[in-house]
Amino acid sequence: MNKVVNVSQATKISRELKNKGKSIVLAGGCFDLLHVGHIRFLKEAKKQGILFILLESDESIRKLKGKKRPIIPLEERVEILLSISYVDYVIPLKGIKNNNDYNELVSKVKPDFIAITKGDFAESLKEKQAKNVGAKIIETIRIKDKSSSKLTEIFRNYLK
């Protein structure tokens, strides 16, 4: 079974799993330069049910973090995430342009839970999305000094 799915496939799979009494969890992110904070986040999210990852596109990461990002291209980030036992499905977010696109995606998949990290820059958006579909928020603690951006900075300074 393919674990890399588009939105319509995720919607169908979500519906089928919910009909079998399973809970659906959405967790989004860039997951560029995977680190222990990511792993703990995914582990906590997985405790609530079947875990779907909304994986940001390379284009969206460049807009968010700068032209030198991502370090790891989308296809490789998909492969890395699928090697983690906590991850059930990955939805690569190609063509997502704005918050309305995210809202529509969440309303189609209809998760029971949306996982966020404390201090998530999109926390209020995700809380609204959760409210709109009747989902609960799973909030995990951000691990200080553990981020892909920090790792990128360390590597760039090391390589100077």
Please give the residue ranges for each predicted region.
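Nucleotidyltransferase catalytic core that binds NTPs
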Residues: 1-160
